[in-house]
């Protein structure tokens, strides 16, 4: 099968067909280009997706990736990044091995096609020229033959006419002979041109056109083969990255199999374990029996020798407000909301054995008053986060991490010690290097001046000493915490028993539960006595504030036991300091022994105000 023999007369159709073939090739090139753009865009989107979910440095997200599930997710993100890289490889290989190669081949193909069809048109024009010469020779031969016939007929007519002179007859004969010769010459020329045309025509249809069409056929077949090879390359480019993509997927599977739910659960314990023991049982509070309260100086002195009783008067406030100084807390509160009780009817205090009772006051007013200082929270959590909650709002973290639970504090301190030790080791290595360099300079002065290293060596030595002092400080705190952790169960039980005696359940829960719902914590100092549970770290924030000054004195006219929150018990005849006079609500704020503060009914005391203090 040959286009030269089978399609010898389809020159124009072959020209259209070969142009269509080039268009198909260019269409395939465009397809591959768009595929490479898709691969690049897909790879870019995958990389952006992987980058988007990568943990940010020095953020809370980075700490979350200690869990195996998060580590597996991080591995998945990294594998997806490599996966995106393989799609970039696909794009690059398709561009270099297919697109660029085919574009160059298309240019060569267009040039070859143009040359072949140029040769075809040239041969076609040549045969057309030969045909025109043949037609011209044929017409000339035909014309000469006709003129020769007419000249012969004219001669015969003149020769037969007796009236024509002999000269005219001779002239007609000569003219006929000339025309006859011209016809013979035209015949010979026509014959020669015809023979030549036939030769050219045979060569055109049997040599030139078959050769040209054969070249065009081979060109077209090469184009078809080339596009097939490009399609194979297209598949091979994809196949080459399949093993690497498979490894990426295997990496994701391996990361998924590395997830350990038990390990993650243990990490949660390590991250949030406080080191405390659960609170003890709450004792039954029998309201049918009268509560015993200390109302005399003798009971006050006796309570110092032994374990103090739990009272609702001034002494009990050390238990009610374990995290705040007395004067600071009381400065936040107003006088009791209900009116004070009237003085007893009997002039003698002994006529009223138990003294007048101030009206029962619900627990809610105190919470309302305390809300002036704190945001609205459930009463059971009223004082849990008072210390650290304020420090968090102020953005302040104690250097010794005392706002963390014991276990978490120990981990923070241990981490700080490890960091300092690493810095010390780094500075020590630098000092050793400088020392060695100085020794080299001493042995070989031409290499450098040893004195030039003295200042640097001094700075490094000072840094090491500073870091060691810092490390010793944190190691001391760490030793303190580690020494305190084993005894925390006994301490927790002691504190639980201490606050179980309180009748105010809200305050009891606040004292036992040190951790607020938002995770803040106030650490207890185990060295403090049982009857005075305070938070020194929180107290330090108010050390710069002085207690309210006394503006006068007062003498108790009647005994007042002060059962309600915010009140203080007094004994008839007792002298106390006045720190806030009656605001018109019937209550006067007093202080006893620079330690206890509270409100008493104004009618129960006789007030002697200091004029200078009042005026100021």
From Swiss-Prot:
Keywords: Acetylation, Cell membrane, Coated pit, Coiled coil, Cytoplasm, Cytoplasmic vesicle, Cytoskeleton, Endocytosis, Lipid-binding, Lysosome, Membrane, Phosphoprotein, SH3 domain. It is found in: Cytoplasm; Cytoplasm, Cytoskeleton; Cytoplasm, Cell cortex; Lysosome. Its main location: cytoplasm. GO terms for cellular component: cell cortex; clathrin-coated pit; cytoplasmic vesicle; cytoskeleton; lysosome; plasma membrane. The modification Phosphoserine is found at residues 296, 299, 348, 358, 496, 520. Residues 549-616 are annotated as: Interaction with ARHGAP17, DAAM1, DIAPH1 and DIAPH2. SUPFAM superfamilies: BAR/IMD domain-like, SH3-domain. Residues 1-334 are annotated as: Interaction with microtubules. Residues 552-608 are annotated as: Interaction with DNM2 and WASL. Homodimerizes, the dimers can polymerize end-to-end to form filamentous structures. Interacts specifically with GTP-bound RND2 and CDC42. Interacts with AKAP9, ARHGAP17, DAAM1, DIAPH1, DIAPH2, DNM1, DNM2, DNM3, FASLG/FASL, microtubules, PDE6G, SNX2 and WASL/N-WASP. May interact with TNKS. This is Formin-binding protein 1. The lineage of its organism: Eukaryota, Metazoa, Chordata, Craniata, Vertebrata.
């Amino acid at each position: 099968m040959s286009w030269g023999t089978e399609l010898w007369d389809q020159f124009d159709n072959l020209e259209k067909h070969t142009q269509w073939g080039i268009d198909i090739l260019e269409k395939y090139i465009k397809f591959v280009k768009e595929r490479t753009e898709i691969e690049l865009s897909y790879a870019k989107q995958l990389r952006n997706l992987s980058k988007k979910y990568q943990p940010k440095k020095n953020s809370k997200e980075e700490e979350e990736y200690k869990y195996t599930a998060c580590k597996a997710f991080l591995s998945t993100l990294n594998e997806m990044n490599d996966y995106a890289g393989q799609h970039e490889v696909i794009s690059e290989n398709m561009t270099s091995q297919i697109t660029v190669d085919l574009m160059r081949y298309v240019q060569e193909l267009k040039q070859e096609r143009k040359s072949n069809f140029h040769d075809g048109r040239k041969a076609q024009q040549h045969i057309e020229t030969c045909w025109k010469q043949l037609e011209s020779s044929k017409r000339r031969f035909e014309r000469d033959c006709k003129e020769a016939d007419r000249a012969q007929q004219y001669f015969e007519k003149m020769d037969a006419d007796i009236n024509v002179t002999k000269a005219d007859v001779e002239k007609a004969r000569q003219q006929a002979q000339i025309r006859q010769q011209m016809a013979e010459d035209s015949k010979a020329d026509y014959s020669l041109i015809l023979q030549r045309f036939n030769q050219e025509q045979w060569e055109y249809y049997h040599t030139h056109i078959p050769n040209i069409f054969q070249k065009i056929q081979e060109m077209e077949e090469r184009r078809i083969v080339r596009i097939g090879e490009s399609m194979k390359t297209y598949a091979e480019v994809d196949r080459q990255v399949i093993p690497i993509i498979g490894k990426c997927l295997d990496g994701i599977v391996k990361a998924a199999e590395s997830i350990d739910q038990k390990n993650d659960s243990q990490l949660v314990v390590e991250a949030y374990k406080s080191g405390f023991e659960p609170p003890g049982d709450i004792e039954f509070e029998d309201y049918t029996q009268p509560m015993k309260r200390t109302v005399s100086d003798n009971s006050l002195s006796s309570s110092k020798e032994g374990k103090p009783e739990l009272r609702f008067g001034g002494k009990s406030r050390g238990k009610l407000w374990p995290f705040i100084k007395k004067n600071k807390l009381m400065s936040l509160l107003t006088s009791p909301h209900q009116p004070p009780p009237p003085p007893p009817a009997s002039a003698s205090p002994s006529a009223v054995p138990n003294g007048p009772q101030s009206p029962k006051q619900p627990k809610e007013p105190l919470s309302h008053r305390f809300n002036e200082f704190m945001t609205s929270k459930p009463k059971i959590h009223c004082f849990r986060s008072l210390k650290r909650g304020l420090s968090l709002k102020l953005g302040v973290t104690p250097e010794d991490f005392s706002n963390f639970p014991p276990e978490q504090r120990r981990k923070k301190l241990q981490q700080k010690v490890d960091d300092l030790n690493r810095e010390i080791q780094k500075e020590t290595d630098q000092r050793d290097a400088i020392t060695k360099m100085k020794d080299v300079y001493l042995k070989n002065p031409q290499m450098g001046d040893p004195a030039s290293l003295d200042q640097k060596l001094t700075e490094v030595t000072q840094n090491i000493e500073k870091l060691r002092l810092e490390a010793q400080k944190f190691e001391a705190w760490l030793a303190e915490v580690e020494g305190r952790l084993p005894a925390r169960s006994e301490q927790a039980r002691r504190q639980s028993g201490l606050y179980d005696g309180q009748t105010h359940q809200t305050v009891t829960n606040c004292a036992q539960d040190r951790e607020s719902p938002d995770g803040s914590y106030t650490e207890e100092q185990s060295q403090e006595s049982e009857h005075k549970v305070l938070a020194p770290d929180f107290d330090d924030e108010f050390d710069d504030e002085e207690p309210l000054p006394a503006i006068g004195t007062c003498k108790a006219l009647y005994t007042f036991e002060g059962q309600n929150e915010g009140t203080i018990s007094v004994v008839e005849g007792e002298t106390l300091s006045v720190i806030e006079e009656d605001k018109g609500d019937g209550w006067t704020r007093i202080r006893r022994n620079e330690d206890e503060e509270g409100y008493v009914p104004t009618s129960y005391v006789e007030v002697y105000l200091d004029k200078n203090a009042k005026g100021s």
